[in-house]
Amino acid sequence: MFHCPLCQHAAHARTSRYITDTTKERYHQCQNVNCSATFITYESVQRYIVKPGEVHVVRPHPLPSGQQIMWM
């Protein structure tokens, strides 16, 4: 949820689309009937706090019944 820049009421996202792998364009509409402004925001990755290292594939945990999933 984003606040309307004109009246500060809640604005709901109506639709969105990826511009790049790290940037999304989102269309919002103000929920205040007296305003009803429609505006666009951009959401993008600025930096990573933690990046995963090398990922090692492991077997899943056994099911509660004690049975294991068979791999083919």
From Swiss-Prot:
Transmembrane segments: none annotated. The keyword Oxidoreductase does not apply. Keywords: Activator, Transcription, Transcription regulation. InterPro entries: Znf_Ogr/Delta (IPR007684). GO terms for biological process: positive regulation of DNA-templated transcription. Cryptic version of the phage P2 OGR protein which acts as an activator of P2 late transcription. This is Prophage late control protein OgrK. It comes from Escherichia coli (strain K12). The gene is ogrK.
